[in-house]
Swiss-Prot record:
Coiled coil: none annotated. It is a single-pass membrane protein. Keywords: Membrane, Transmembrane, Transmembrane helix. This is Uncharacterized protein HI_0173. Its main location: membrane. GO terms for cellular component: membrane. It comes from the Bacteria. InterPro entries: NqrM. It holds the Pfam family NqrM. It is found in: Membrane. Signal peptide: none annotated. The chain crosses the membrane at residues 4-24.
Amino acid sequence: MQTLFFTLIAFVAIILLMSIGFIIKKQSLKGSCGGLSTLGIAKACDCDKPCDTHHSKLDAGDEQAKAEYEQKFAKKDDDSQFYQVK
């Protein structure tokens, strides 16, 4: 029981010290070194239908948007229910 109490006090003290340091520096939180962009992922999209922005690109005749539409949203012959892992 003493070990549990000591561990709890240690965690609270560490969190308190980190919060004081954060307040003193007055810096905003920053992301890691690139996040998903370092993995080559532009953005995550699990939508069943394209959004308005994508529709406007398609209407404007953007070839890259058309290729992306075919890859993500066009119905395929196989009726698989799973996402493809890239």
